[in-house]
Amino acid sequence: MALLKKTFSLFSKNKTLMTCVILYSILSTLIVGGYGFFLLTNKGSPELGIGDGSLYFLSFALRFSLIALVVFMFIGYEFFTRAKRDASLEWITATQNGLWKLYLSQFAVTAAVVLVATIPQALLQAVFYSVNQTAYPAYLLFALACVFVYLFLTPLAGVCIALAASLLAKRIVSYLLMLLFAVLGSGYATNLYEAAYEIARIDLSNVARLLEIMPPSMQYEPSAFYGYSLRGFQIAAIFFWISLSFAVAAFLLVRHKRISVRAGAVLPCGLAAVACLIWTVLPASTMTQTVYGSKDDGAYYSSDMEREIDAQYRASGYDMVLKFGRQLTAEVAMAVDSPNLEAYPMTLYHGYQIKSVTDDTGEPLRYTRDGDYLTVENNPSGSLREIRLAYAGYSSTFYSNSQAVYLPGSFPYYPQPGFHTVFSTRYDGYEKNTLIQPAQFRIEIKAPYQVFSNLRESDGVFSGNTEAPTLLSGFIDSFEMQGSKIVFSVFWELTRDEIKERIAEIDLFENPELKGKSVFWIPRTRYDNRELAFVFDDSLVSVGISNIPGSNFRQKIPTRKIGLANLLENYEEFEADFLTREGSPEDKAYYAGLYALEQYYGREKLEELCRKFLLDDADQRTDMDFVIELAGALPRSAQQQAWNGEGN
């Protein structure tokens, strides 16, 4: 205790260190508090478009995690290096294990200073929650946990790095190492990881995960549905650096001691670091706003992975047990209506690793797998009525973990009969994949939170008949409107009342195709070119409201034709350079042909012709073939006028 008092006295008398602490504490409190006042006085402002504002307030506060890391690394390094040179502490360094005790005392004092500097940020979150009357009761605990992890544990890891650096290298080298750690830990090195994979196919995603000790608010806005990722493996990454730093410091302090002393000092910290390392890099699901390397679907998929094979059987029912923990763990029993087939092709997202495939008696079934495509062979009796699969894994886009879940019914997180394209490389987005006909579902959910679905729920079990079972949780609530269940994020840019107004404005439920369906407002993903809104037999999922009518039309269009729909939607944007666009001769003929058709028929007639083609399932032509053939049938004078850029 005497040593702690002496060490604290030494810290408090150091003007440089105290000035840094006071400036950081006062400025961060004033700036974050001022932003909170701005949000409260402008709550509900359509210009801001941030809805409740709670997540944005938290996001702003967490931006100080990088500043806190740098400030306390500097404070820690200067304190560790100056204290051991202080004449008043020479008596402790001369005693047995004195230097080790001194460093532990310094660490304890610095950790206490970090904690004291964090308390105002926690209080600000509590005050904002109370004054703002935030609609989600559990949010305050989440916000305080984020403050603790990113504004206390992250700077504390910086203090530990500073401790190791003060023993390991001279001042300039130490500061360079600490600066490098801060930059890599902030997430700004993402471009480096992406370049490494694009150029050399070096996957650094696990290295990146180990360095992700700060919130994504440094680069991205928070997800209204998920908030910020606050998972065990991220906390383990922070403790990895703490444990590793202590192991390095312990080794340097006792390197001249006998082996037993060195082992006793280094081994516990080293084992803790290894345990945290393993926990960090093991596969885990999270909500990611940027993914690089082989785990990114944009990098994984190529055009030769796109397959379409109709199944000769139908799934008549599913009995599923889904556990959301570190990742999705699933046990699925799929009843099939054709028991005598030789093989049963199905689609299951490649990120889910299969543990076993059996029949209804538990006998193993032979199977082959190629990415998303799984083929299960019939049992020896040739009469297969049920296929049971056990698998575990995750998607880098559609998360399913102990914090929240987002599994739209259009995504094959459950086995779907036949081979279907999961991800379109042409349009950089996920396709709509559902069952050919509705099946009876029973889904038992094991999760530490409430889950919403288009199926009926009773005691954690969802059941009902559907072609696409959607599962969604997070900062979610629901209400009834015109016989439909509306599921939305309480932190979305629109409030409950504003959602009702917007739905009424566009007469959403006046459309007979949408009337009575459950509506799920869903998170945006990195690849939402094709999944802005999907309409199913009993529900629809959408990232917004105004886009639903257009998306309802778009999803009826086959992928091979969607390019024409994109051009028509943005015709004014593309029209100016139709005739000057670069590309192959076919591309140029396509753009020139579309321009000629618009000039000859007029915009309204062109859209009518194109709409008929887009919705005609029997017409197997691509959009390019359709436009070139139709333009080729125009009078030669009209074609020539179009090529010359002349209107009618």
PLM segments and residue spans:
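Hydrophobic alpha-helical transmembrane segments
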Residues: 1-83, 254-269, 277, 488-494
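Secretory targeting signals
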Residues: 44-68, 78, 104-171
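Helix-loop-helix units of permease transmembrane domains in multi-pass membrane transporters
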Residues: 75-115
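N-terminal, polar/Ser/Thr-rich
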Residues: 137-138, 193-240, 259-327
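Solvent-exposed beta-hairpin/edge-strand motifs
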Residues: 343-364, 416, 440-452
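A surface-exposed beta-strand-loop module
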Residues: 350-406, 505
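Extended, low-hydrophobicity, Ser/Thr/Pro/Gly-biased non-transmembrane segments
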Residues: 392-467
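Juxtacatalytic substrate-recognition/specificity segment
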Residues: 477-571, 575-577, 581-582
